[in-house]
Amino acid sequence: NRLSFGVQTFNDDLLKKIGRSHRAKDVFESIENAKTAGFDNISIDLIYSLPGQSKQDFVQSIQTALGLGLVHYSGYSLIIEPKTVFYNLMQKGKLPLPGEDAEAEMYETLMEQMESGGLRQYEISNFAVPGYESRHNLTYWDNEEYFGFGAGAHGYVNGIRQSNYGPLKK
């Protein structure tokens, strides 16, 4: 019963650069609306190593995120997938990504800031107030069974991982 927002960053310039339609103010408004509607288990996802992102940009996003007082946060390094706009730009040398050392520093900073904020790291990318860890994630890492329902869903039953077809075409 968690509501999760794909914030990525609170830096409006970076959001625009990576093609996101939302801005930081939209995140604040959405989280406030969720709280007003009665949600208390709210999570946000941040991404680091974005094109043109500095360590200071990421630190500011972490501090802004922690200021929201949520119970769960995820922090992921940007992964460039084939057949995407970012992949094509990278192939042409037109995607200014932070180097590996900068990426490692951002991850270390994420861990330090989350711990300082009272959150416990319970897997490589996830941090939670104790008791608010993702049950699905823990089930996955503990090699327990789970069912996947719906287009594109994944499951693990009787030692076999399976995925459903998806997404559906219009």
Regions found by a protein language model. Give the residues of each.
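C-terminal scaffold of the Radical SAM
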Residues: 1-170
